[in-house]
């Protein structure tokens, strides 16, 4: 079977983004967003989801990081949707409760074709590195809507903002890896409607 891949480019007055995603990769990444902590998070997403991910972003960071994070989320969600394709034979659902020291984060995914985000988290710092913590929700909102997936992220325990955000990205990666994986018992798509 061929690898499920997508290449997406998005150009606006605020950002220029190129991304390639391979859902059937080995966790290789080449990430350049201009925000070091965001690069670190996307690298963790690729590595722990075993996705190959290449991201190049030229954003208006002289304003702030808002457009860079939001638009990267739109492009990642679009790449996920395109790479998943017709969803024949995939598990559709995935979830993970992931620990990182004092932090425990739940992520659950349904590749149902209906966009929805439930995000339950509180941060105690405005930024981690140069990344604004309030933009974490905006990033995942953009991913979920562009991918047309249900995405739940809930912090069950935690104190360190770096750990919380990192656990979110890794838990999402693990949940998405499960949801996009194949089950030989599934004929067609996993839906009583016959389509997703």
Predicted segments, located by residue:
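Structural preference for solvent-exposed beta-strand-turn elements
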Residues: 1-196
């Amino acid at each position: 079977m061929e690898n499920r891949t997508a290449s997406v480019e998005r150009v606006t007055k605020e950002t220029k983004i190129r991304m390639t995603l391979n859902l059937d990769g080995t966790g290789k990444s080449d990430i350049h967003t201009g925000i070091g902590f965001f690069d670190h998070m996307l690298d963790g997403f690729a590595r722990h989801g075993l996705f190959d991910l290449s991201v190049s972003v030229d954003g208006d960071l002289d304003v702030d990081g808002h457009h860079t994070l939001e638009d990267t989320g739109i492009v990642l969600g679009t790449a996920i949707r395109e790479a998943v394709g017709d969803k024949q034979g995939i598990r559709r659902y995935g979830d993970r409760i992931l620990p990182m020291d004092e932090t425990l984060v739940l992520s659950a995914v349904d590749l149902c074709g209906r966009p929805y985000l439930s995000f339950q988290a509180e941060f105690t710092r405005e930024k981690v590195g140069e990344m604004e913590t309030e933009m974490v929700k905006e990033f995942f909102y953009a991913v979920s809507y562009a991918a047309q997936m249900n995405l739940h992220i809930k912090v069950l325990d935690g104190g360190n903002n770096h750990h919380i955000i990192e656990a979110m990205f890794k838990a999402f990666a693990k949940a998405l890896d499960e949801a996009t994986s194949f089950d030989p018992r599934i004929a067609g798509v996993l839906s009583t409607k016959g389509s997703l």
